[in-house]
Each structure stands twice: as structure tokens, then as C-alpha cells.
Amino acid sequence: MKISDGNWLIQPGLNLIHPLQMFEVEQQGNEMVVYAAPRDVRERTWQLDTPLFTLRFFSPQEDIVGVRIEHFQGALNNGPHYPLNILQDVKVTIENTERYAEFKSGNLSARVSKGEFWSLDFLRNGERITGSQVKNNGYVQDTNNQRNYMFERLDLGVGETVYGLGERFTALVRNGQTVETWNRDGGTSTEQAYKNIPFYMTNRGYGVLVNHPQCVSFEVGSEKVSKVQFSVESEYLEYFVIDGPTPKAVLDRYTRFTGRPALPPAWSFGLWLTTSFTTNYDEATVNSFIDGMAERNLPLHVFHFDCFWMKAFQWCDFEWDPLTFPDPEGMIRRLKAKGLKICVWINPYIGQKSPVFKELQEKGYLLKRPDGSLWQWDKWQPGLAIYDFTNPDACKWYADKLKGLVAMGVDCFKTDFGERIPTDVQWFDGSDPQKMHNHYAYIYNELVWNVLKDTVGEEEAVLFARSASVGAQKFPVHWGGDCYANYESMAESLRGGLSIGLSGFGFWSHDIGGFENTAPAHVYKRWCAFGLLSSHSRLHGSKSYRVPWAYDDESCDVVRFFTQLKCRMMPYLYREAARANARGTPMMRAMMMEFPDDPACDYLDRQYMLGDNVMVAPVFTEAGDVQFYLPEGRWTHLWHNDELDGSRWHKQQHGFLSLPVYVRDNTLLALGNNDQRPDYAWHEGTAFHLFNLQDGHEAVCEVPDADGSVIFTLKAARTGNTITVTGTGEAKNWTLCLRNIVKVNGLQGGSQAESEQGLVVTPQGNALTITL
């Protein structure tokens, strides 16, 4: 919301009350409580007829400082509330001096000044990183609609850039944007977002989580160009400042606080193919797709049935359409015999035509209006109603239906929708409708996730989810929603993926080839390269199929090449996935996250790091023209083997079987021996590639097992012209390729052979000494 009108005025109809002076400070257990008045109250006359703000400073985890600014403490505060991991024994320090009161957790402290002018500062090791000054936080009375708000404005420094706030498709850097965290079904081409997360981070190495599930209004360097303003309709405002000091460290602490991304099963990293949305399909159509992929040697790992596996007008009652799929169990059994995993589409709504609608209504499993009638409308399905997942019995009914599908052979669910949740309703458990609007996405996906956890096991659980709220990163995978079939939408999708990664989500996908309309073949091929160098890869459309031969023969070559490449990259990719699970670092990440000290990376949103070591720059033109930036160092193309200097921009042109994929120097990269499946023994026949190891540096490569744990570690250390290689753990028949090195002066512990990419060394054991 806009509060100010320029620099000196406020918006018509608003009354503002600010904390201006500290009146008193107390220590209450591990909290520091500050009482602040909106005027000078040193004289008793001014201590009457005045509001008094209560500010509570506390720490739910080390290096996280919570701030709660309260006006009326007696206001209703119904749930839901974010499921945060709050620790009770965090060590804090509270200091009360003549000049200030300071609350400290780890390296982060909040300092409130005493005296004539109000000041709230956040400091890292005593150095200010942000804060708010006089008249930049407080209470807003809106006489236009008789609503009351709390707001805060935190300072932005010169050159400070803001990221996150969920999966947003606008410019990656949020500066200058107005953001309302209200889940909407708006596609990828608008300011709306399926996944609104009231958390942002900046390139100064800290993050801020606003702890309100309802709509939070952000003015990011917009209303006040050197401030991030956030406001909420409430009698209190609670937020957490999370220290880094690096972007990775911020996400580590944030996801420790809100939940780590679960580790998806290895098979989910393979290629997914769908029926598409409104296309005509039955078992014969499905088999033609799957057999067509096999005939063309196109690896395929997951097949997805979209909405029309159920009867029209009845979604979602979880009954297969008997006319289209008369033998679903047999069909699934036959498909799984071909080595496929099966996914089916669901959502949290039900059409009035369904035979079970009356039962659900009578049992109270559907969302009601305050007068007791069902909430219904005719969008999406006629007479559509919404499952009330605050009712435990409704959850059990829904879960039992899903368990029946799992028993039939379904492996996972596409949890679509969950954004257009109304507020003129009465929830079974009395939840606040404003808060439940966004939080519904969490309880919906949590319910489905728990079904899979209880049936196939957590190590096999995976969703394909569209909506999300804070904490929903625990239930991967998420995809970017409905995009158009053009380069602009492809770029929008990438921005959304980078944005959600900066918001705590580790795994992300998008509709390869675009969802709406049908892409020209050149767009499809470029998108396939990008999609198969994403954490998860799915071919999906709306009114047309996405099998590659529907475009041209070369599309088959592109899908084959990049699917096989991804399968070979799985030792590297799954180790990065395990790190996302352990630390919250997304697999696909903005350049600024990996290179926070390089200011040239701050605004880059057409390229990304795939894990720690590989830079990918998708091509967004038919001709193949692409520009990209490489940070400091010497970079090598993953398969072309050309080397480029960093700290500069590069311009190239690529065919459809290529794009810029560069590996940074001092990298030891593991490639597997299987180009047909993502799930195999990655420690057997592993081909390690050593890229530009510099004198005095060490490269370490950890090869994961199926559970993400490290089964084998290879280290290469260079001193002068000598490289010492040592392996520990379990590995069979591994090799080491010295990229762009064709000859060595000495080799101990193995044999050597030439290759196009460099000298390949086969060890006799697990130790090598190489003299360059």
C-alpha cells in the first residue's frame, strides 16, 4: 500500500502514528521489550491520552533477530501461522546503556536509540546493515475504509539490490517494484504470482521474513526509493532479520528456520512427458507417445496424465473415466513394465456433477460461507466447491482417495491450483480467511506429501506443485505455471525460477516448449536445452502435444542429446540436490548467489549457475545469438572444450545442439556412465573431469549414493607442476580426464590415453601423482 504522497505528505484519509521516543526498556526472559511513545513523554502531562508501542526483540535461532511491533494486544490473532522452527535455548545478549538498548544473537544485533530521535538499527558485528529512522515505522489508520495497518521501512544502501518475495516473473531485482503477497492464478506473463513468499534478501548479505500469512504489501525502493516498506492489516507487525553474511548463508539460516527442501528421488530428475491438458488422449494415445519415444531412442522416465484422466465436470473425485480408461490398473501395470513412473493430475476442488459431491457436502468436508451454505462458483468446474483441509475428516477422505491411486500404481501427483481461495468463508477450524488464502497452498501440498510419505516412503515422495506459501519448499518439486510458447515467456520462466530459488525453494521446473499455444520448432528446441539443464524437466502443453516429432526431426535429436547429457550429469546433479536438502541452496541459482562479490552479477537474469560449478546461458533467439557474462577465472565449455576468460562478457552463436555451458576453473566434475536413466550406481564407471586446476588449489568431488549421502570422494591438489589425486570410499572403474591437457611429464599409479577433451588417466588404485 502507498502511505506517503511524495516526500512530505501522506495519502488522503490516512492518519499515521510513529514511535518517536523510547520510554522504557525491560528484559523479559530472553526477550528485550521496548516501550516507545509517539511523542516526548518525559513530562507527565504528555503521558496521558497517547498510544504506546510495545516492541519485542527475540531470537528464534542464532543470527536471526525477531521484531514484533504491537499496538493493541487484545486484537484477535486466529491462525493459521507459519510452521517455523523456533528454538527455546538460543543464547542472546541484552545491553542497556545510557545511549541505546541492544539485543544480540550471534553476530546480529538490533539497537534502539534513546534520546530525542527514534532509531532502530540492525548491525553485523557492530556494523550497520539496515534499519529504520524516525517516522519510518508505525501504525496507519485508514479513514477511507476504517482499516488499520502496521508498517516498517528498512533502509537500502547505495547499490543495494533486493531479491526474492516468491516466484515472480518480473525483473529479477525487485528494486522499484510494488509487490502484494497474495497467491493468484496469473500465468508467467503478469505481475501476479502462484507462490508468494514474504521473504527477501539483498546483496548486502541479509534477509527479511515478514511473519504474516495474509497479504503483505511491499514497496521495494518504489514509494521511498531508498527503503523497503512492508505493511500489513493488523494491530501488530512481526518480522525477522536473518544474517548471512553471504546469500548462501542467508538461505541456510532461512530454510533451517522455515524448513529444508526435501530430497526428491533420483528418478524424478529424468524426463517427464504428459498427455498435455485439453488434447484428446486414451491408452492408445499414451502408448503411441511412449513407444514413439522408445523407437527414436529418446529416454523417458515419467509419464503424466493430466486432468482428463477423470470424467469432465467432476474434478476432483479421483475416479478414472471408464470410457477413456476402462482398465486403469492394467494400463498402469503395463506402463510401469516399460520402466516408467506414473504421475496423475489433481487439485483441491470438486465439481457439483460428481456423484460424491452430495456426500462431501453432507459430511461438512467442503468450504462454507459464513451463513453455512457452500462456497461455490462456476469457474473451472460448474458448481465448483473447495475441500476444507482444516477439517481432519475431510483430509482423511481426500488422503484415502490418493492412497487408492498409489495402491493402483501411481507414483506421484501433480498438485495443481490452490491459489484462488476465497475470503468470504468460514473454515471448519475457525481459521482467519485472510491468512488461509495463501496458507491453503501449504496445507494442500502437505496433505498430499504425507500420503506419499506414508505409502511409498519419504525417500520416494515427490510432487509437481504450482502454488506455495512459506515452508512449502519442504514438498518439492514446484513448477512455474502457465507460460506462452515464445522466447519472452521462456525468459519469464527463468526469472521465476531464479526468484523462487532466492526464496528458499531448492527444486524447480517449467513447461518445456511453453504451455499456451504451440511453439515454432526453433523455440521448442531452444526450450528443450534449457529445460533439460534445469533441476526437473517436463514436456507439457495445453491444446497440443509436446512429443518432439510433432515439431521436426531435429527436435528429436535435441531431446535425445540433452536428456542423455542430463543422465550422465547425475552424479554431479544429485550431489547438488543433496546440498539443497542440507543447506537450502537451490540447484538453479542466480549468478549473484554464487558470486556475491562480483557486482556485475547483481542484475543477471538470463543465465544461471546449475550447482556450484556449471554456468548455463539459455539461448533466446532462433539464430542462436547469445550474450553472457563469466565471473573471474578460466572457464571451459562442458562438451566443446573451448576455454574463455572470466570477468568479461562474451557473445556467441549456437546451433540447436548447443548453448553456453561453462565449467569454472579448479573444478572436479563427475559424469556417470549411463545416458539412458538418471537413477543408477553413480560411483561405478565414473568419469571425473578436472578443469584448470591452479597452483595452490584443491578440487574436491563428492559422488552421492541414492540417498544423497557421499559414497566416494575424489580430491585433486596441485603444488607447482604436481597434481596429487586421492580417492576415499567406494568406487569402481573410475577415470580422470585432464581437460585440455594433452601430455604430462610423469604419471604414477595409473595409465594414460589420449582423448579429444584431454588426457584420460585410468588409476590402478585410488591414488595418482601427475607431473605436468
Where are these regions (language model features)?
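N-terminal accessory segment at the very beginning of proteins
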Residues: M1-A262, A266-S268, T274-S276, Y281-D291, ...
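Beta-sheet entry/capping signal
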Residues: I64-V65, S109, S119, P198-F199, ...
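Aromatic- and carboxylate-enriched substrate-binding clefts and catalytic-loop regions
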Residues: E70-F72, H81, P299-V559, E594-D598, ...
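Short, hydrophobic/amphipathic alpha-helical packing segments
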Residues: D155, N175-T178, A193, N287, ...
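N-terminal small/glycine-rich loop or linker at the start of catalytic domains
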Residues: A262-S276, S373-I386
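Catalytic core of carbohydrate-active enzymes
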Residues: W449-V462, A468-W479, E492-G496, I500-H510, ...
